[in-house]
Amino acid sequence: MAGKPLRCISVGKLKTPFWKDAAAHYLTRIKRWRHLEYTEVRDGDAALPPDQRNALEGRRIVEALAPQDVALVLDEHGQKLSSPQLAALLRRLDQEARGRACFVVGGAWGLDDSVRQRAFKVLSLSDMTLPHELARVVLLEQIYRAECILRKVPYHH
């Protein structure tokens, strides 16, 4: 059973080798079952104040979203889901949504409100603030875990 294609949009490129390796590891595992398109939008100029940088990055994210994308935006103040709940959400979107699920990870300074307003759901990975590079890897691991749950593959305990 292949689910609908997924998409992830994030700000900036992974620069640190171990984050790149970890992301590639989970992308390879996910792609056994489901196509996942990963889009990196250019981050804002570091010389800009954080609010202006967020606004610029927010515009780039919103422009990168296709009209039919079902945006699942990651934000520290979002709804927390267990891994089985994320799997159930992906199953529901596979069955009911017209577009593909598109996870959105902001940059080092978070997200502009315009991105949250475009969201179908705003989700949180943790009560703790995570570096955006780590958040990307955690998200990919959770997508892989959700796929294992949906397929009853022994990975989630």
UniProtKB/Swiss-Prot annotation:
This is Ribosomal RNA large subunit methyltransferase H. It catalyses: pseudouridine(1915) in 23S rRNA + S-adenosyl-L-methionine = N(3)-methylpseudouridine(1915) in 23S rRNA + S-adenosyl-L-homocysteine + H(+). S-adenosyl-L-methionine binds at L74, G106, L125, S126, D127, M128, T129, L130. SUPFAM superfamilies: alpha/beta knot. HAMAP family: 23SrRNA_methyltr_H (MF_00658). It is found in: Cytoplasm. Keywords: Cytoplasm, Methyltransferase, rRNA processing, S-adenosyl-L-methionine, Transferase. Pfam families: SPOUT_MTase. Its EC number is 2.1.1.177. Its main location: cytoplasm. Specifically methylates the pseudouridine at position 1915 (m3Psi1915) in 23S rRNA. GO terms for molecular function: rRNA (pseudouridine-N3-)-methyltransferase activity. Belongs to the RNA methyltransferase RlmH family. GO terms for cellular component: cytoplasm. Homodimer. It comes from Desulfovibrio desulfuricans (strain ATCC 27774 / DSM 6949 / MB). The keyword tRNA processing does not apply.
